[in-house]
């Protein structure tokens, strides 16, 4: 109760002056608040002319009006905001801007940033220029990877061209190895055949007797066997390389065929012995390349080995018999009896001695007499008869009974 009385006493003790001051202060504050609420910023419209430059040439001028506050100078930011509204966002980023400004007795272009003030040229005239941005560093940076790719392209081509022949040589070497494995097993059979051909070529009438006629015939006869051998080798290599390039999956089949050859079923490419091998295939001794490999028991493998050994022995015997027949034929023929004696040929009744080997110059060829042609035709007939005999002997070895095979295998084991 006492506290309330004190407060009332204080309020009653206030002077009227203090009351008037407080009222005036409140009124002034209210007026200021009303002025702030009712007060609006005052803007102005500024006329701006701008040019655009492309390829170093000024285009026709453009005119715009920019709104800016009266108490602030015109800035480039205000113009850019207006341009983005009128012509899009890319307009401002594609050009570098500068304003026309009086300098001494003339005018200059003053480069501007975004927050820089635009100075008027004459009184209140604002002129701007927008020039295309040319970043040389960006052009160089863009051109460098292109030049690098252009330079890398020939390098990559060179590397590819170097790698391709290596791959080709690798496949070719594989083919040569495969052919070499097949040829190693057939060397024993080819040696006898080569000895026979060398002996017949050294004792033929064309190799010695035709020297007096012309040197061209002698060279052609000597080069024919070499050419045939080289042609056969090239054919085998080309076939093997083509197979490796076209069908790289054929390698396991080749390996299977090589294992079969090692087991005792040789496959020989000879043309004279083709008929015999076809007959053997018909009997069931040899499996062709194109069939899938079948699972064989150890007993069947041993039988196949024995059959292969017997086939090889029979072929060797036939070759030896053929050589003996050729030797007998050559010994019976008087023309091949004395190869070291002086050789003479008859041409229309006149005798022409053989020319020595030291003479290299080619002489004009002479026509051979009828007697020589008759002798040559006889030789050809005899050769045909021998071939027929060979074919007959090969046909006899068509199928071998198993009893003979078992007996021969027992003899081999002994």
Curated annotation (Swiss-Prot):
InterPro entries: SOK, SOK_DIX, SOK_magnoliopsida. Residues 205-229 have a biased composition (Polar residues). Keywords: Cell cycle, Cell division, Cell membrane, Developmental protein, Membrane. Induction: Epigenetically down-regulated by vernalization. Not regulated by SUF4. A motif (Association to cell membranes) lies at residues 283-284. It is a peripheral membrane protein. The keyword Membrane applies. Expressed during embryogenesis and in roots. Residues 173-192 have a biased composition (Acidic residues). Signal peptide: none annotated. It is found in: Cell membrane. GO terms for biological process: cell division; plant organ morphogenesis; protein polymerization; regulation of cell division; regulation of root morphogenesis; specification of plant organ axis polarity. GO terms for molecular function: protein homodimerization activity. PANTHER family: PROTEIN SOSEKI 2, UPSTREAM OF FLC PROTEIN (DUF966). Belongs to the SOSEKI family. The DIX-like oligomerization domain is required for polymerization, edge localization and biological activity. 'Soseki' means cornerstone in Japanese. This is Protein SOSEKI 2. The lineage of its organism: Eukaryota, Viridiplantae, Streptophyta, Embryophyta, Tracheophyta. The gene is SOK2.
């Amino acid at each position: 109760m006492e506290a309330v009385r004190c407060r009332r006493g204080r309020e009653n003790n206030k002077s009227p002056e203090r009351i008037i001051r407080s009222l005036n202060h409140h009124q002034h504050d209210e007026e200021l608040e009303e002025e702030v609420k009712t007060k609006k910023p005052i803007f102005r419209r500024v006329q701006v002319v701008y040019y655009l430059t492309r390829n170093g040439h000024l285009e026709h001028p453009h005119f715009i009006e920019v709104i800016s506050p009266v108490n602030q100078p015109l800035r480039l930011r205000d113009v850019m905001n207006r341009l983005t509204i009128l012509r899009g966002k890319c307009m401002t980023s594609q050009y570098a801007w500068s304003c026309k400004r009086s300098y001494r007795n003339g005018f200059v272009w003053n480069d501007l940033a975004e927050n820089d003030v635009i100075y008027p040229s004459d009184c209140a005239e604002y002129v701007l220029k927008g020039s295309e941005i040319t970043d040389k560093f960006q052009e160089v940076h863009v051109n460098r990877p292109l030049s690098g790719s252009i330079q890398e392209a020939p390098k990559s081509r060179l590397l590819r061209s170097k790698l391709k022949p290596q791959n080709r040589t690798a496949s070719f070497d594989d083919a040569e190895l495969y052919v070499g494995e097949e040829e190693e097993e057939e060397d024993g059979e080819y040696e006898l055949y080569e000895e026979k051909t060398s002996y017949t070529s050294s004792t033929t009438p064309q190799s010695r007797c035709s020297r007096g006629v012309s040197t061209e015939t002698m060279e052609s006869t000597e080069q024919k066997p070499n050419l045939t051998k080289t042609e056969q080798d090239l054919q085998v290599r080309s076939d093997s390389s083509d197979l490796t390039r076209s069908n790289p999956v054929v390698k396991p089949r080749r390996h299977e065929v090589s294992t079969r050859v090692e087991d005792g079923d040789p496959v020989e490419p000879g043309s004279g012995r083709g008929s015999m091998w076809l007959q053997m295939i018909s009997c069931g001794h040899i499996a062709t390349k194109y069939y899938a490999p079948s699972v064989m028991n150890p007993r069947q493998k041993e039988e196949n080995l024995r059959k292969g050994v017997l086939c090889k022995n029979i072929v060797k015997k036939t070759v030896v018999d053929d050589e003996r027949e050729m030797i007998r034929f050559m010994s019976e023929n008087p023309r091949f009896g004395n190869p070291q004696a002086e050789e003479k040929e008859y041409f229309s009744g006149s005798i022409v001695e053989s020319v020595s080997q030291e003479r290299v110059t080619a002489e004009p060829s002479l026509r051979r007499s009828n007697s020589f042609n008759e002798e040559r035709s006889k030789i050809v007939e005899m050769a045909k008869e021998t071939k027929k005999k060979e074919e007959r002997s090969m046909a006899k070895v068509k199928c071998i009974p198993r009893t003979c095979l078992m007996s021969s295998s027992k003899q081999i084991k002994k």
